[in-house]
Each structure stands twice: as structure tokens, then as C-alpha cells.
Amino acid sequence: MLNNSIRVRATASVANVSCGFDCIGYAIAKPGDIVTIEKQDQPGIEISMSGIKYESIPVDPENNTAGKAILSLLDTVESKQGFKVHIEKGIPPGSGIGSSSASAAAAVVGVNELLNKPLENSELLVHGMAGEAVASGGFHADN
């Protein structure tokens, strides 16, 4: 049976731990973002949002961390599949606990699953980093 939708939760994280700045990190059980992804017949990414302080986050896929991460993944696997993406922000934007990276991570995991896992989990990081570049201006994985 083929799945047409998936719901993925990504937790907050801390990457700047004492003298282990960007080297030592950990995940936090709460809060977290919930990303619901549904296949759609037409190509493209359609993003909607709800939750904590989401109003300032762009829904244009090129300017949204989850959207950009999905576009990066789709480009790599050469897929024209379209998706509706709903991001429920549980991690406050700008809080320093991985708000942007959580949305991107959940998005690439979910899309990869809906595409029947064309990529290994280890190959997903680079696509999350493409999303993070939208928020931070840099291609890095610090959360």
C-alpha cells in the first residue's frame, strides 16, 4: 500500500554546549515541530503554517527552510513530485534551539519516506543544510 501523506516530528536541539561549541550537542524531547506532508498531483511545494510565532516565517519554498530542503532533495533524486506541507511550529523561531533545522529535518525525512526512500538517512543531512542556509545564510549543520 502506498502512502500519500506522512506526519513527522522533529525535536529541539542544543548545539552550543560549553567548550564544545558546534561539536557537542543534544536533542531535547520538548518542544518540537510537527510537519505534515501530502503528495499532490501538480508539481511544486505548497507550504502552510501554524503554531508558535509562525507569522514571520515565509511560506515561499525558496525562502522557507523546509521548502528549500525539499527542493534540494527533489533536485537530487530528479523528481517532479509535488507536495503540500503544513508546519506546526512548536519551537519558537529565533530561540536558538533549532527551530529552522527541525522543520528542515522533518521535511526531508518525510519526503524521502513518501518517495519510497531513494536516499539513505546519511544522505539527507546535506538537504537539511540547504534549508538551514535560508535561515542563517550559511551551509552548516550546527543544530
Spell out what each predicted region is.
Residues M1-S95, E113, K117:
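ATP-binding N-lobe of GHMP and related small-molecule kinases
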Residues K80-N143:
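Gly/Ser-rich oxyanion-binding loop with an adjacent helix/lid
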